[in-house]
Design a protein with these regions (language model features):
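Sequence signature of WD/YWTD-type beta-propeller architectures
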Residues: 1-409
Length: 409
């Protein structure tokens, strides 16, 4: 177990894709806390030498964070807040965008057009937590809508979207805050402000994860028969080619003044879990976690309470069926989790230590002990070569990056 960063400030890992493809560098942002989006740099640290490099530095009062890496290239995607923020337009869920840094060049991922009649392939608000698909072709994100937020904040429902490499998209620029994008961006989830209780309708889609390269799983908030929020697992199939990404379904891709952007034709949202009758219904929101498929795309892992109320890892097929309880721990899993690249185990925080469980048996192995402070719940991430696992931990008053080897010595 070794400390990797030492500077007297916070270092924030995203919950997946935080390593360069060669397993040599960890990328991070420098937000003073997860909730305060005020970092100015995206950086990386060499896990062997400790060398630190600045990948991108924001200017004009903008802030940046939540960086992830392309699976095969040193291409970084992250959130960029507004330049020259003012009272009317400053960082918010519906005022942020994805940008890609590659070989020192920076380009917009998503375009934004907030002036009716809007532009197909452009968003109308903010994108967040951008994650490349396993083959590096597509980028998933969560989304909030400026147009509906201004109309009524209750209509601005969080959704899941995908940016596909079929740009550029160039809105007319009728508003000074609009911008072009290099990718074609659409929503792939469907929400409604008032879901029918007991139905498959949802009012929030979030915490998505890739299932292979052509499907996305995510958490969707349903309502029980008595109107209680119950987070369930959903999956969507994605278009296969440029024509399909641009094909209009039953509503405009770009949305209207009254409605959110709609998914392309043929994108079907399907519910995978049905937990309303369980002793502890629903996937858990604490710890905050992103649903994650194994590398083969054959099993989706998520966190849910067992009948004793303990947060455990569960697995389900993307085709559906009954979820299988994987872990049988005596206390809660305490963090987001990830699959080892070999697909044979998952890593997370348990009993304030870094732990792995076997993907078949659920048997837990601890990789660390004697932490000064508990590891952060935000991220536990394996290196692409599978040799290391990284996390964050408060050390002398600042959040630092730490590493352990995954091999059992």
């Amino acid at each position: 177990m070794k400390q990797i960063t030492f500077a007297s400030r916070n270092h924030q890992l995203t919950n997946i894709n935080t390593w360069t493809p060669d397993s040599q560098w960890l990328v991070y942002d420098v937000r003073p806390s997860g909730a305060s989006f005020t970092g100015e740099t995206i950086e990386r640290v060499n896990v062997v030498t400790g060398e630190v490099e600045v990948i991108y530095r924001a200017t004009d009062g903008a802030h940046v964070g939540v960086v992830t890496v392309h699976p095969a290239q040193e291409k970084y995607v992250f959130i960029h807040g507004p330049k020259n923020p003012d009272a009317d337009w400053h960082y918010d869920f519906h005022h942020r965008q994805g940008v890609i840094a590659h070989h020192g060049q920076v380009s917009n991922l998503d375009a934004m057009d907030i002036t009716s009649p809007f532009t197909p392939g452009a968003l109308r608000g903010g994108s967040h937590v951008h994650v490349f698909s396993p083959n590096g072709q597509l980028v998933s994100f969560t989304y909030n809508d400026h147009v509906l937020h201004v109309r009524d904040a209750k209509l601005d429902l969080r959704n899941v979207g995908v940016a596909a490499p079929y740009g550029p998209v160039n809105p007319p620029g009728n508003h000074p805050r609009e911008y072009p994008g290099t990718y074609w961006s659409v929503l792939v989830s469907r929400t409604t402000p008032n879901p029918q209780p007991g139905s498959d309708e949802i009012n929030r889609a979030y915490e998505e994860g890739w299932v292979g390269n052509d499907r996305l799983a995510f958490i969707g908030d349903t309502l029980s028969a008595t109107g209680e929020k119950v987070p369930e697992l959903f999956i969507v199939n994605l278009p296969e080619d440029e024509q399909s990404w641009k094909r209009v379904g039953d509503a405009p891709l770009q949305g209207t003044a009254e409605t959110l952007p709609a998914p392309p034709a043929g994108v079907k949202q399907r519910r995978l879990t049905f937990t309303h009758q369980r002793a502890y219904p629903g996937l858990v929101n604490v710890p905050r976690h992103w649903v994650r498929s194994n590398p083969e795309g054959a099993q989706i892992a998520f966190l849910m309470r067992d009948d004793n109320g303990i947060v455990q890892l569960w697995l389900i097929s993307p085709e559906g069926g009954e979820p299988r309880q994987l872990t049988r721990n005596g206390s809660d899993i305490q963090s987001a989790f990830n699959w080892h690249p070999a697909g044979d185990r998952l890593g997370f925080v348990l009993e304030n230590r870094i732990a792995c469980c076997d993907a078949q048996t659920g048997q837990v192995t601890f990789l660390t002990s004697d932490h000064g402070n508990p590891p952060s719940a935000d991220a536990v991430v394996f290196s692409p070569d599978g040799r290391f696992i990284a996390w964050m931990e408060e050390t002398d008053g600042f959040r630092q990056l730490w590493l352990a080897e995954t091999a059992q010595n």
